[in-house]
A protein has these predicted regions:
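Juxtamembrane helix-loop-helix connectors linking adjacent transmembrane helices
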Residues: 2-16, 30-113, 131
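Alpha-helical transmembrane segments of polytopic integral membrane proteins
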Residues: 22-27, 69-73, 113, 117, ...
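Functionally important transmembrane alpha-helices
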Residues: 132, 136-193
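Hydrophobic core segments of transmembrane alpha-helices in multi-pass, intramembrane catalytic enzymes
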Residues: 18-19, 105-108, 158-166
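Hydrophobic membrane-targeting alpha-helices
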Residues: 25-29, 67, 71-75, 148, ...
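Membrane-interface helix/loop boundary segments of multi-pass membrane proteins
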Residues: 36, 53-54, 63, 67, ...
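Transmembrane alpha-helix interface/packing and boundary motifs in multi-pass membrane proteins
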Residues: 108-115, 147-152
Length: 193
């Protein structure tokens, strides 16, 4: 297997291997809850129907949050310089000519990452923080953990702004699917850029 394809396969398998255990633990925890006490749509509120409203809500929120995220990124680069943050593997694959490697990396970034990260940050962390600290602090706290989890100093503030938008979308829509759509749009545009 060529180097870019080999590394794209490794990223896809590695991401799935890292995401599966916490999701299985979460499932076992949720299975033990009294179903009568759960909010409409379940604790994670994974209501897909109607899917077109999720697409609309996610797309609209993405359009609303994109200007402040881009502005924050521009200000960061203007005042502290380019701190990097771009994934070196992504650059290697994008500079290569293997369409399968590019496709596998796109699936990881645009489908798997938004599904997993929204389940963790907006599906679990946001409501847990909300119960302990209130809505405002839960929005900020989940956004901060989301930004820090990406391990990129140069992208910390733009990711914090993105996380704030995702958390507010989750609270306003009452569903996770619009957040996944918004996150996928963000990752997709970032991937293409």
């Amino acid at each position: 297997i060529a180097a870019p394809l080999n590394q794209s396969v490794a990223v896809l398998i590695g991401y799935c291997a890292l995401a599966t255990p916490p999701l299985l633990i979460l499932k076992s925890q949720l299975d033990g809850l009294d179903q009568r006490l759960l909010p409409a749509g379940g604790w994670l509120q994974w209501r897909v129907s109607p899917w077109w409203t999720a697409l609309f809500q996610g797309g609209r929120a993405w359009l609303m949050v994109m200007p402040p995220v881009v502005l924050t990124g521009w200000l960061m680069s203007r005042f502290i310089g380019d701190q990097g943050g771009s994934n070196p593997l992504l650059e290697m694959v994008l500079n290569g000519s293997d369409p399968l490697a590019l496709f596998l990396l796109a699936i990881t970034a645009v489908v798997l990452a938004p599904l997993f990260e929204e389940t963790v940050f907006r599906g679990v962390l946001l409501p847990v923080l909300g119960r302990s600290f209130g809505r405002g602090w839960s929005v900020f706290g989940s956004a901060l953990v989301f930004a820090v989890a990406h391990l990129s100093i140069g992208e910390l503030l733009p990711l914090l702004v993105l996380g704030l938008g995702l958390a507010l979308l989750r609270l306003s829509s009452g569903r996770l699917l619009p957040c996944v759509v918004m996150h996928a749009l963000w990752n997709g545009v970032t991937f293409l850029n």
